[in-house]
Design a protein with these regions (language model features):
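Glycan-processing catalytic domains of CAZymes
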Residues: 1-332
Length: 332
C-alpha cells in the first residue's frame, strides 16, 4: 500500500465492493495488515432490503467485525450525505408532505427521527458500532439524528471556514466527533484541487481540531492511473502533511473557537449562498439575509476561530465561548 507509511486510516467507500463480502474482507485485511484503521461503507442495512438483494451477510459481518479486527475497526460509514440528499435531491424529503401549516420544527422532527425507523441503524446501535457519514449541509441535525461522526466536505466552492464552524460547533456542543473529507473541486477532470490547496485544507482542518482528515480518491484520472485521481504531487502533499503532524504534535486543535454564532432553533437553511433553500420546502425568509450578513462579518473577523450552532435549550452555549453572537443582533 503506497500510503501506509504516512497515513493511519483507510475508508472503504465503494458501493460495488460493499455488495461483495469476500472483497470487503480482503481489502479490510490488507489495510489492517498495513497498519491502518478501517471504516467500512454500507448504503443499507435494513434486513428486508438486504434479503431482497441477497446481502444478509452484512448483518453477520456487523456482529463479528469488532471481534475480528479489534480496535482497528473504527465503525461503519452508513448512507451518505443525508442533509445534502434532503435539501437537493428529494430522496428523503419526498417521504414527508409539507402543507401550509407545516413549520420548521415539524420538518426538523421528521428529519432527526429518521433513524428511529431505520432497522439498519438499529443494527449498528445493537452492535455498539460507531456510525459515520459525510455531508455538506445540516451537520447539526445529522448529529441529532444519531450519527456519531460527521465528515464535512472540503474542496467544493464552499468556504472551508464556514463548514468547519458549522460541523465543529455542532460536534462541540453535542459531544460528538468530527472530521473533513477533501472532495472534488470540479465535476470534471482533474476533479481534485491542486496538491498545494489540498495540503492547506488538510492542515486547516487538523489545526482546527478535526479528528479525521480524509481524501476522496475517485474516480480514475487520467486513464491508467492506478491510484484514482491522486497524482504523485498529491501523494507528496499527503506525506508532507503527515510528517508535519509528526514533527508538530501540538498543532492538532491549536486553533480553537473564540466566538459562536447562534442561529434560530431548527432553522434548516443550507447556507451555501443567500438564495439557498430551507428544509427543501421553503425559499429564504426574512431571517436569511440578516443571518447571511452577520455570518460574513464574523467569518471575516474570526475565520476558523468561529463556531456556528443553533438555539437549543438542550445544548446551551453559555460558558462554552468567550463571545456569543445571535443571528438577529447588529455588529458595529
Amino acid at each position: 500500500m503506497r500510503v501506509k507509511d504516512y497515513t493511519n486510516l483507510f475508508v472503504l467507500q465503494s458501493g460495488p465492493v460493499s455488495e461483495n463480502e469476500t472483497a470487503t474482507n480482503e481489502i479490510c485485511d490488507y489495510a489492517v495488515d498495513a497498519g491502518l484503521d478501517i471504516i467500512v461503507y454500507f448504503g443499507d442495512l435494513q434486513p428486508k432490503i438486504l434479503l431482497d438483494k441477497d446481502l444478509l451477510w452484512r448483518l453477520s459481518w456487523l456482529s463479528t467485525a469488532k471481534q475480528y479486527w479489534g480496535d482497528k475497526f473504527l465503525g461503519v460509514y452508513y448512507y451518505d450525505e443525508p442533509g445534502g440528499n434532503w435539501l437537493d435531491y428529494d430522496r428523503w424529503s419526498t417521504l414527508f408532505e409539507a402543507t401550509s401549516n407545516t413549520t420548521y420544527d415539524d420538518v426538523a422532527k421528521v428529519y432527526t427521527e429518521c433513524t428511529q425507523y431505520d432497522e439498519g441503524y438499529q443494527q449498528l446501535e445493537d452492535n455498539s458500532i460507531t456510525v459515520f457519514t459525510s455531508d455538506y449541509v445540516l451537520y447539526w441535525f445529522d448529529y441529532l439524528m444519531g450519527y456519531d461522526v460527521i465528515f464535512a466536505h472540503a474542496g467544493w466552492d464552499h468556504t472551508l471556514e464556514q463548514d468547519i464552524a458549522l460541523v465543529r460547533g455542532a460536534a462541540n456542543l453535542q459531544n460528538k466527533s468530527w472530521g473533513t473529507i477533501i472532495t472534488w473541486k470540479y465535476n470534471h477532470p482533474p476533479y481534485l484541487d491542486t496538491p498545494e490547496n489540498v495540503y492547506e485544507q488538510m492542515w486547516t482542518s487538523y489545526e482546527a481540531g478535526a479528528n479525521y482528515v480524509i481524501i476522496f480518491n475517485y474516480p480514475t484520472y487520467p486513464e491508467g492511473n492506478q491510484y484514482g485521481v491522486m497524482t504523485d504531487e498529491h501523494f507528496d502533499a499527503l506525506e508532507s502533511f503527515w510528517n508535519d503532524i509528526v514533527k508538530n504534535p501540538v498543532v492538532h486543535g491549536s486553533v480553537k473557537a473564540e466566538a459562536v454564532l447562534v442561529l434560530p432553533q431548527n432553522y434548516g437553511w443550507g447556507m451555501r449562498n443567500p438564495e439557498d433553500n430551507i428544509w427543501a420546502f421553503w425559499e429564504p425568509d426574512e431571517k436569511s439575509e440578516q443571518i447571511w450578513t452577520i455570518l460574513q462579518q464574523l467569518l471575516t473577523q474570526y475565520g476558523t476561530h468561529l463556531d456556528i450552532v443553533y438555539d437549543d435549550p438542550a445544548f446551551p452555549v453559555t460558558g462554552n465561548y468567550q463571545q456569543i453572537y445571535y443571528w438577529n443582533q447588529t455588529i458595529t
